[in-house]
């Protein structure tokens, strides 16, 4: 796991070769190809610009599968605070980064048994494919 600026632990950050826009589009394609769905794309920088503020290119993609997430939320209702899964795609001084909360962190936070924690683990391979590692 990599810590972001400001000491945020429990997150994983990977460098993406594409722009923020390209990375978001590719992530949406990969999510769909795996039979999941994108529930929302939150354009933080776009909304900031809309009210006259400046923010580095910053977008959060919420995605998942009701078949995978529902058993987790049924067992641990508070896990709905973190589901669907989220990936932050952001510009870090000209380098696109992809950051998400590590599945192990989520499992520990909510005391998920291994069977349920495994339902969240696909975010690692998905983001590896996204960034080409």
Language model regions located:
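Well-ordered alpha/beta subsegment
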Residues: 109-133
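Beta-strand/loop substructures that line and gate deep hydrophobic ligand-binding cavities in soluble
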Residues: 86-110
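Terminal, regulation- and interaction-focused segments at domain boundaries
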Residues: 2-35
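A generic alpha-helix structural signal
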Residues: 24-28, 73, 120, 124-127
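Compact, glycine-rich, soluble single-domain proteins
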Residues: 30, 39-88
């Amino acid at each position: 796991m990599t810590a972001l600026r400001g000491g945020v632990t429990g997150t994983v950050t990977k460098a993406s070769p594409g722009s923020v826009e390209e990375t978001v589009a590719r992530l949406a394609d990969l999510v769909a190809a795996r039979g999941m769905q994108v529930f929302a794309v939150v354009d933080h920088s776009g909304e900031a610009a809309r009210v006259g503020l400046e923010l580095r290119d910053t977008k959060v993609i919420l995605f998942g599968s009701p078949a995978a997430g529902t058993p987790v939320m049924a067992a641990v209702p508070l896990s709905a605070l973190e589901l669907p899964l989220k990936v932050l795609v952001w510009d870090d001084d000209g380098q696109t980064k992809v950051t998400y909360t590590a599945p192990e962190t989520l499992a520990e936070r909510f005391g998920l048994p291994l069977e349920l924690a495994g339902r969240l683990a696909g975010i690692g391979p998905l983001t590896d494919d996204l960034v080409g590692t």
